[in-house]
Each structure stands twice: as C-alpha cells, then as structure tokens.
Amino acid sequence: MKILMRADTHVSYSVPAEGTKANFTFSQVLAALSVSLCSLVVGFVSAYTSPALVSMTDRTITSFEVTKDAGSWVGGIMPLAALAGGITGGPLIEYLGRRNTILATAVPFIVSSLLIACAVNVIMILCGRFLTGFCVGIASLSLPVYLGETLQPEVRGTLGLLPTALGNIGILVCYVAGSFMNWSILAFLGAALPVPFLILMIIIPETPRWFVNRGQEERARKALKWLRGKEADVEPELKDLMQSQAEADSQATRNTCLELFKRINLKPLSISLGLMFFQQFSGINAVIFYTVQIFKDAGSTIDSNLCTIIVGIVNFFATFMGIILIDRLGRKILLYVSDIAMILTLSILGGFFYCKAHGPDVSHLGWLPLSCFVIYILGFSLGFGPIPWLMMGEILPAKIRGPAASVVTAFNWFCTFVVTKTFQDLTVAMGPHGAFWLFGVVCIVGLFFVIIYVPETRGKSLEEIERKMMGRVPISAVVNIKPFSFNM
C-alpha cells in the first residue's frame, strides 16, 4: 500500500528489472487514486461489524434489542449481498461502462450507512448492510477492471495495488474509530467517506478499451490523451486496442454463456477462479479468528480492539511492501513468497495448538504463535490477498471481461461465505490444529497451481497478455522455473 506524486504534470517511475525508465502522467495517478478511494470505503464497511457489534448489542447504548442470532446476520449478510452484487456488476460494467458503474455505487454507499446510523430496529440495519454488501460486490470487480484498462504496463502492478492499500487503510480507520465510537456514530463516519471518491470520480474518464468496444474511436483517443498526457503519441496504442477488439469481434458469439466456456476462454477464467479459491481457503479467516487467542498465548494483556488495530497495521505495511516490489519482482515471485510463508506458519500454528491441547507443555513458547501470526499476515497481504484481484483485471479476455469478472467475483464472495459459516464447525470437528493443517495443505496445492498454471504479467500490455493466453505460447516464466504447458 504507496504513491509517488510531484507538483508538476508528470511522475517518473523506474523499473530496474527492465532496465528502462517508464514515464506516466499524473493523470494515471489521479485515476488510480480516485477509484482506490472507493476501495477505502469498501474496507471501512467490510470491517464495520467487528467494532460495531460490541456497542450494538449493549442495551444501555442501543434502544432496541439485537440478539446473538441477529448480530450474526448483521455480519453474515454482507458476503451474500456482495455475491449478488458481483453477479450484477458484470453486465453493468459492459453497458454503463467501468467508470460509471464505480461512480454509481457512491450514493448507495452513503444511503446504506445513513440507514444503519439512523436505524430504530434490526431490519433497518440488515437492509443497510445488504445494500452495503451489494455495492461492495460491484466495486470488487469494477476497480481491477478499470485500473487494468487504464494504466500503463510498467506501473500497472504498483498503481494496481493502490485499492488494496486504501482498502486496508479503510479497515484500520474503522478499527481505530470503532474503539471509541458507538455503532451509530461510526456509521455516520462511514456515510461521509464516499464523498471525496464521488467528487474525484466525476473528473476521470471512462476506459479507452470500453470506448473502443462501443465503436467510439474519438472518445477513446481523448481518454488516452487524458491518461497518457497531451504530448503523448497515443495512435499506436489506439491502433493496438482497435486491432485487439476486431480480433475479439471476429471470434465472438452472441451467447455470453457459450462465450465464457469456450475452450479458448477457459484457461484465463479457470486461472482467475483458482486464485480466488486459494485466496479464500488459505486460512486467513482461521488466523484472524484466533487473533486474540494468539496474543493471549504470547502472554499479552492487549485487549481485542488493539489486536484488530495491530492486524490492520501489519496488513498496511505488507501491502506497502507489495506496491514497491510487484513491478520489480513480478506477480509470481510475490505469490511464491506469500504461499511459502503461509504454509510454514500454518504448519507451526497447527503444531502449537496440537501440543497445547494434547501435550507437551508449550506455555513457554508464547512468542511462537505471535511470530507466526505476524509472518502469516505479512505473507497473505503481500501476495494472495491483493494479487488475485489485480490479475483478474489483467488476464480475462476483453470480449468476456464483464461477465467473466462477474463470475469470478461472485465465486470469491461465495467462498468467503462458505469459509466464514463453516469455520467454527470445522474447528469443532477437527480442532483448531486440524483446521490450520488443512488450510496449510490447501496452500501447498495452491503453490503448485501458481507454478504450473499462473502466468507472469509484469510489464505486458493487456493486448499482449490476451494474445499469448489465447495462443499456445506460455507466458508463465519466473527465474529458471519453466512452466508446464496448459492448452485447453
């Protein structure tokens, strides 16, 4: 989670791995920042229930009763609504455009938070949370698609991780504010956060790719000029966009479902689905769930609110590292580091909790789970947290990008709901040690998935990625690891 700005009209960014300097305009930074402010809102509303439920269930603060069951739905309804939003968002970004779809979530975000803040019963809170989740689902797929289609290849990774950075800032703001605000005042704060994002989104243009898709060549040229700078020669890029669109049109069918499941499109779709699966089943919910217990085992007297704030700080620091490294090392290297860190820490955490339950005595090793916790969060936030979303906007073919992103986003939120709802049952059946080890095995499978199937997209234009993904030439190569061929 970092952004580089200067007072003049351009920002210079050097990519050492390529040995060249890539210049990109301040406009691209502004575009990335504008849509990333939406991610800040997403982070805030996603974290809302964690601090809010404490005061919401306190009858001395809340004028109406919020039962334990109702409280679980206040937290659990958002992933279901986000799933619905993900399904809806695909058609919206195709028909309204990427920018307009993101912009359209601003007012509902404000309304949903006001609905919660002014609630006089649980139904109003649930309606507000459902509307919030619906907008989160739409934003989840719209942001990476917009950034993927507007940013230059040399900085697409760096600026493409900006939504994750601001999303983690939103989570941190919610945790800190929630430590001294009750649920109603916290919701009023949530209603104010979309205002800057609403204002800035009006300034930035639609993506050139969407204009080309609509046959609006002149508007695409103007959008490219805005993004690349008035003095930039955008004709080669525009020509490449139009050629790519012509190729896509020549192969397209009218049936979207049939188009999605063509052999030529299954490869990028399955890679994106796989990354989302391994993201959600990597054990992140298990580790977060046991945060307070891990701190207690380390002999800490830190209260639960401060624990969540520490999680937010570690999250932010890791994503900040990712922003610095992603366009230098590439996506796959960060995924390798992320996966290996999670495998090791989940294995050790499983062993610690097993020994705690069955012996020998490990009370003197309280520092061990705490160290594993920090390393795990760092690893997840460095790779498997943000990169699946970034790559979704990079590898999905243009002709199916809307519906495919919709499927992938809905699948992600479905996995989130399944993991959240079944995790406690899993720990009862297997014990916490069994749950940690199971997630560790999933991460091992995920590592081989990345090695074999996931392509390296660093420094490549979307058109280049698409052509190579559609062909038989694998673009998945990192250091001296040669990928297996994957022809579908």
Curated annotation (Swiss-Prot):
Signal peptide: none
Annotated TM spans: 29-49, 73-93, 106-126, 130-150, 161-181, 185-205, 269-289, 306-326, 333-353, 373-393, 403-423, 434-454
Chief location: membrane
MF-aspect GO terms: sugar transmembrane transporter activity
Pfam families assigned to the protein according to its UniProt record, in alphabetical order: Sugar_tr (PF00083)
This protein's GO CC annotations: plasma membrane
Glycosylation: residue positions: 182
Topology versus the membrane: Multi-pass membrane protein
Residue numbers on the Extracellular membrane side: 50-72, 127-129, 182-184, 290-305, 354-372, 424-433
Cytoplasmic face of the membrane: 1-28, 94-105, 151-160, 206-268, 327-332, 394-402, 455-488
InterPro entries in alphabetical order: MFS_dom, MFS_ERD6/Tret1-like, MFS_sugar_transport-like, MFS_trans_sf, MFS_Trehalose_Transporter, Sugar/inositol_transpt, Sugar_transporter_CS
Subcellular localization, as worded in the UniProt entry: Cell membrane
Keywords: Cell membrane, Glycoprotein, Membrane, Transmembrane, Transmembrane helix
Function, as annotated: Fails to transport trehalose.
Family, as annotated: Belongs to the major facilitator superfamily. Sugar transporter (TC 2.A.1.1) family. Trehalose transporter subfamily.
Record-given protein name: Facilitated trehalose transporter Tret1-2 homolog
Source species: Drosophila sechellia (Fruit fly)
